[in-house]
Amino acid sequence: MAFPKVYFDMTIDGQPAGRIVMELYTDKTPRTAENFRALCTGEKGVGGTGKPLHFKGSKFHRVIPNFMCQGGDFTAGNGTGGESIYGSKFEDENFERKHTGPGILSMANAGANTNGSQFFICTVKTDWLDGKHVVFGQVVEGLDVVKAIEKVGSSSGKPTKPVVVADCGQLS
């Protein structure tokens, strides 16, 4: 099965930082993968909040070195917002895939069944998140870009420079 591939063209402090290409696990997590794919293309238009259902222009608002890089809050931009293509929140699909190492793509949440649009990319193995966060993809190109983003992180999570998804979409 060929998994769909999506991309983020990233900027750090307004400067191009490169492309992150991710494959989405449509076999085990089809609803979660479809949500992320559609938020990369922007094809669903405007959501219930009145904001476009699109990652383009959104920030990575939380970056913690030796842990993860988190983004996807395109409504508030600070980690309090976001919206799925299914409405505000949707259920945890399953926890079959694990947080095995750098490049794992997983849903950020505020507890069980609170998935929206926020996600994170692991920079290390984060097995304590297994069974709590839905893994739905992985970085297949551009792990160096993820590492560059990680370098502008902080222990509080607030990036020292703005990290923005300048463009995004689907490759295959």
From Swiss-Prot:
Keywords per UniProt: Chaperone, Cytoplasm, Hypersensitive response, Isomerase, Plant defense, Rotamase
Record-linked CDD domains: cyclophilin_ABH_like (cd01926)
Gene3D superfamilies xrefs: Cyclophilin-like
Keyword Protease: no
Ranges that cross the membrane: none
GO biological process, one term: signal transduction
InterPro entries per the UniProt record, alphabetical: Cyclophilin-like_dom_sf (IPR029000), Cyclophilin-type_PPIase (IPR024936), Cyclophilin-type_PPIase_CS (IPR020892), Cyclophilin-type_PPIase_dom (IPR002130)
GO CC, any one term: cytosol
Similarity comment: Belongs to the cyclophilin-type PPIase family.
Function, in words: PPIases accelerate the folding of proteins. It catalyzes the cis-trans isomerization of proline imidic peptide bonds in oligopeptides. Involved in de-etiolation. Reduces the sensitivity to brassinosteroids by decreasing somehow the abundance of the partially dephosphorylated form of BES1. Triggers the activation of bacterial AvrRpt2 protease activity upon infection by P.syringae. Activated AvrRpt2 confers virulence in plant lacking the RPS2 resistance gene.
Name this protein carries in UniProt: Peptidyl-prolyl cis-trans isomerase CYP18-3
Organism encoding this protein: Arabidopsis thaliana (Mouse-ear cress)
Lineage: Eukaryota, Viridiplantae, Streptophyta, Embryophyta, Tracheophyta
